[in-house]
Curated annotation (Swiss-Prot):
Catalytic class of the enzyme: transferase
PANTHER family xrefs: TRNA N6-ADENOSINE THREONYLCARBAMOYLTRANSFERASE (PTHR11735), TRNA N6-ADENOSINE THREONYLCARBAMOYLTRANSFERASE, MITOCHONDRIAL (PTHR11735:SF6)
CDD domains assigned: ASKHA_NBD_TsaD_bac (cd24133)
Organism: Mycolicibacterium smegmatis (strain ATCC 700084 / mc(2)155)
Location of this chain's protein in the cell: Cytoplasm
Binding site for substrate: 135-139, 169, 182, 186, 274
Principal location: cytoplasm
Protein residues bound to Fe cation: 113, 117, 302
Record protein name field: tRNA N6-adenosine threonylcarbamoyltransferase
Length: 340
């Protein structure tokens, strides 16, 4: 079964094509992405109206490239990110997916963007066993119990304020690194001393929920430190900030896996591309006897391939198509895999 999927939740226009085989395995056939990040950079963040217009302009050419790369003209299924995300951006992708599905006479599946991030990993590491999922991106930070990609996901905890990726962008802006800040801040942090400046670790006290995150206080602590120490090395500030984020994320994720008796930790989402997070996760998983799975960096960021993979797993588990009047949902919770 050939599944074509559209991703348009934020500032990447993605079209992915995957093959769901009879044995349940999923093979990637095409993964084409067009980004409007440069158009947003001068504003210091994503501008929803610009993102929506960029999707309108990029979707047709991106679709053509994906079909050509896969060597097909018509899939068996069309899927799309139906939420969560920016309202206007979602509308563009969902409307296009419905139109393609109707024109080709094939079923439409509106699926969860966050589930897609988890499902991207199967392209690199094969079928996903029961896992604890640490989902970290610009707008989301969740700890999840993933029994399988075809079953409802259980949320163990999330952030009470800023997402990890949001904190990265805000600190990068504070240090004058521009937008998007995650990759540039990561590169700067590698040249600094992560022990030179110790920033607070939010929600790690004895009375705090072990699976809940908070990064707003960390962001404020960095801002106050830079204001009080204008001569401080920005590389050391970046390294200290990054160490705080990676420390909290990995400690809570490893604890969740240990508490649940689950032997696999999956880290997914845009922040999963961060070098220190990956490094510290490897160290802590090895010490705890856990198997760590992290997609290649290209599959950590938004793309259509991940949506095709998640749709494939839902279909394999018996999910029925979404109606063509299914509405996009900017606030779709992570526990709801599909709008049916």
């Amino acid at each position: 079964m050939i599944i074509l999927a559209i991703e348009s939740s934020c500032d990447e226009t993605g079209v992915g094509i995957a093959d769901l085989r009879d044995d349940g395995t999923v093979t990637l056939l095409a993964d084409e992405v067009a980004s409007s990040v440069d158009e947003h950079a001068r504003f210091g963040g994503v501008v929803p109206e610009i993102a929506s217009r960029a999707h309108l302009e990029a979707l047709g050419p991106t679709m053509r490239r994906a079909l050509d790369a896969a060597g097909i003209e018509r899939p068996d299924v069309v899927a799309a990110t139906i939420g969560p995300g920016l309202a206007g951006a979602l509308l563009v992708g969902v409307a296009a997916a419905k139109a393609y599905a109707a024109g080709w006479g094939v079923p439409f599946y509106g699926v969860n963007h966050l589930g897609g991030h988890l499902a991207a990993d199967v392209y690199d590491h094969g079928p996903l066993p029961e896992s604890v999922g640490l989902l970290v991106s610009g707008g989301h930070t969740h700890l999840l119990h993933v029994r399988s990609l075809g079953e409802p996901i259980i949320e163990l905890g999330s952030t009470v304020d800023d997402a990890a990726g949001e904190a990265y962008d805000k600190v990068a802006r504070l240090l004058g690194l521009g937008y998007p800040g995650g990759r540039v801040l990561d590169e700067l942090a590698r040249t600094g001393d992560r022990d030179a400046i110790v920033f607070p670790r939010g929600m790690t006290g004895p009375r705090d929920d072990p699976y809940t995150f908070s990064f707003s206080g960390l962001k404020t602590a960095v801002a106050r430190y830079v204001e009080a120490h204008p001569e401080a090395s920005h590389a050391d500030v970046a390294a200290g900030f990054q160490e705080s984020v990676a420390d909290v994320l990995t400690a809570k994720a490893v604890r969740a896996a240990t508490d649940l008796g689950v032997s696999t930790l999956l880290i997914a989402g845009g922040v999963a591309a961060n070098s220190r997070l990956r490094e510290l996760a490897e160290e802590r998983c090895a010490a705890a006897g856990l198997t760590l799975r992290v997609p290649r960096p290209r599959l950590c960021t938004d793309n259509g391939a991940m949506i095709a993979s998640f749709a494939a797993h839902l279909i394999a588990a018996g999910a029925q198509p979404s109606p063509l009047d299914a509405a996009s949902d900017p606030g779709l919770p992570v526990v709801k895999g599909q709008v049916a």
